[in-house]
Amino acid sequence: MKSTVFFKKILSKSFALLVLTGNLATTSSAQILFFNNGAKIYTGTSAVIYINGGFQNDNSAATPNFFENNGTMTIATSGTPGSVFLTANSILQGNGTYLVEQNWTNDATFIAGNSTVNFNGTLQEYITSTTATITTFNNLVLAGTGFGNNRKKTLQLVDAKIGANGTLNLNDRELETLTQTLFVLNPSNTCVTNSTILGSEGFVSSNFNIGGSGSLSRVTNSILSYIFPTGSSVSGTRYRPVILTPASGSANTYTARLGYNDAVSDGFNTAALDTTMCIVNPIFYHEIKRSSGNDNADIEIFYNQTADGGWDGMAKWNSITPGIWNDMGAVTANVNIPLSSVLKVNWADFSNSPYILSRKKPPIPGLTCASVCPNSLGNTFSAVGTGSSYTWTSPAGTTITSGQNTSAVTIDWGAVSGPVSVTTSSPLGCASSAASCTVNPSSAVVTAFSSAPTGLKYDFTDISTGGANQWSWDFGDGSVSTLQNPSHTYAACGPQRICLTASKDNCVDTACSDIDVNELYIIPNIFTPDGDGINDIFFINNSCIKEYTLEIYNRWGMKIFESSSGGWDGRTKSGVEVSDGTYYYIFKAVSLLAGKDYNSKGFVSLVRKK
């Protein structure tokens, strides 16, 4: 039975516009406003068809019909849903544009050509089939203004494909695959695009559970980066994409999907970790597969640090150790706004799928325990590590006095033995395993020394016990030494306090002794004033002498020389050389020390070398 047809046809040089306001034919579905039952229809590139309701392409004949659209065809929702039904033995083909405001049911044949299908409805739209027929789109565009579930364009009970030259433009919509897969067969790395505006991202979502298969699949043939814009609208919109970068230009196929829930609910125990990690992401994880090809690939997983916390590692389930999350080794953590990422370069093992972000334990810090002295103060312990903070422990009977949270601490040690331990933590708060060493206090050092004077020169000897291996001498006049057995010559006489500090490791002891540096003078009995610079002067070496006079007499008792500031050079006061021979001297001195004066007399021989 046919109903009345109301339409208006407008022609111009550039296009024809057909507006349908009633049914062309009645069908079993009240949703259909345009029903083609076997007719061959062709529209040119300038044609515009607007259908205020559903469109069904059908054919009850054995020979397939075709509807070829090369123009723009709008299937709008107005009172009745604007859905597309391809049924029976029909063919829809052409290079035109389809603007679909509701569902797409393909039980027949769709030949995409260079066409574009734009799902732009304000309600949730479905791509489906009752005969498991997969639609291969050329360009697939998701648009519309709906919110919440009405953002979704959903694969229902059937997979879908993007052709070898096609594109996928998600805009700010959600492509919900549920348990199905969208296969992108175009190997161009730029054929998938989406909005990345925070809160309005376009993404592909999937049901994620044990054995689930919803995903986005992409073929690759270059070393460029391929985005997998995965996300979820469970409890709010969350965009958590993955970028894969193959190692070569060979053909590969990779798939990815996001599980926006704690992995433990899908059978992947987030408490089962190898020893290099302290926690894995309890909010989401990814499944990433290489379904064909052999290339390694860089894997970069993105997250929102504000919503998800910070992460600096990546882990994989079941490899190498079954039943736990295994750290994937060295990665690069990039902190940005709004999305941060963790990058694993040149990953090879695609044997097991689930991947998750992790917090890596820093390496165990290096720690060497110093020897300490019983009941000693200020013992220093240092660790070498890569963490940003350190936590120290020491046994009962000791006290950490400074340095907690840093790489070096000082500890006041009692008379106990026991372990010192330290862990280092990453900026994300993940602590390393502990480094530990046991401290057994050394024997105490008891300092002692002796001294042997020769005038102003003193020889000091260490006689400490306890195995001291370091010495610090203070000679009392501002001079010091670190020799074990030093000598020191004083510049003046008088009392001095000598102190020796002897130590072994942190066992330190100090002993002091007072000495009285006395004067000394030495009178030679011969000199040779022949101008060779050797023993040319008759000089009485002296110390601690306040003042003195030196008088020289010849054999007849005549004084030929006198001085209070120097020695005799073998000349008279007037500068005349005297002859070789034996001369008489008188040396009178006043000591710096009260009550001590000296008066020495004797003979000295003057011999000039021939």
Where is each model-derived feature located?
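Bacterial Sec-dependent N-terminal signal peptides
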Residues: 1-37, 355-360
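A glycine-anchored, Pro-Gly-centered beta-turn/N-cap motif
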Residues: 96, 456, 494, 579-585
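Extracellular/lumenal mature domains of secreted and surface-exposed proteins
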Residues: 362-391, 399-525, 533-536
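Short loop/turn motifs at secondary-structure boundaries
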Residues: 514-610
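Short proline/glycine-enriched turn/loop motifs at strand-loop junctions of beta-rich domains
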Residues: 294, 305-309, 384-390, 465-469, ...
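Extracellular beta-sheet-rich ligand-binding/adhesion modules
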Residues: 28-333, 346-351, 358
